[in-house]
Design a protein with these regions (language model features):
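Active-site-lining helix/loop region of Rossmann-like oxidoreductase modules
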Residues: 27-180
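Short beta-strands and strand-loop turn motifs
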Residues: 1-2, 146
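Rossmann-fold NAD(P)-binding glycine/threonine-rich loop
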Residues: 2-26
Length: 180
């Protein structure tokens, strides 16, 4: 089971090659904050024209990233929402490997890392890690907004992340599965 989804996003061809062998299967637990994955996969069958995800978190969640430092953003003095990145998921995910796993999974399950738009925001008004997912396509459109409590031990991730891994393991052993 893969825990760090950003690694999958950085090496998708290697993952697909390894998974092409009969004895190899990759299982990725859903990141703690993810929702709408089944709807996205279903919409892709009908045809997705646009897909974006915004990951907005309190400034503390973005500390320690070299990319943020190169922007010159002072997270301790931030008094308004600040866009740290906006562009293709392929370009943004490597800059925030601990924070945007949800974008990596959704992009890989959806229309790919190049066509998925990612916006990363540090917002001092937030107390929750917020993910806004917007999908448009031939079957219609949907928006999913998730607001998760940050992990007390690691504000870069949701407090649901460890439960997500447990749910994935439980699902592997279950004879009945709902969704994905």
């Amino acid at each position: 089971m893969v825990g760090r989804k950003a690694l999958l996003a950085q090496h998708p061809d290697a993952v697909l090659e390894a998974a092409s062998h009969d004895a190899v299967r990759f299982f990725s637990s859903h990141p703690g904050g993810i929702g709408g994955l089944d709807a996205l996969k279903t919409a892709c069958l009908a045809g997705v024209e646009g897909f974006s995800i915004q990951v907005a978190k309190p400034p503390a969640a973005w500390r320690g990233f070299r990319f943020v430092e190169t922007l010159g953003v002072d997270l301790d003095r931030l008094d308004h929402a600040c866009t740290l990145f906006e562009g293709p998921a392929r370009e943004g995910v490597p800059h925030f490997p601990q924070n945007v796993n949800i974008a990596a999974v959704l992009a890989l399950a959806g229309i790919g890392m190049d066509r998925t738009r990612l916006k990363v925001v540090a917002d001092p008004a937030l107390t929750l890690n917020t993910h806004t997912i917007l999908v448009t396509g031939r079957s219609g459109r949907f928006t999913v907004v998730l607001e998760n409590v940050p992990s007390p031990d690691n504000p870069k991730t949701s407090s649901l992340a460890c439960y997500s891994a447990l749910a994935a393991v439980r699902s592997l052993g279950s004879r009945v599965r709902y969704g994905g």
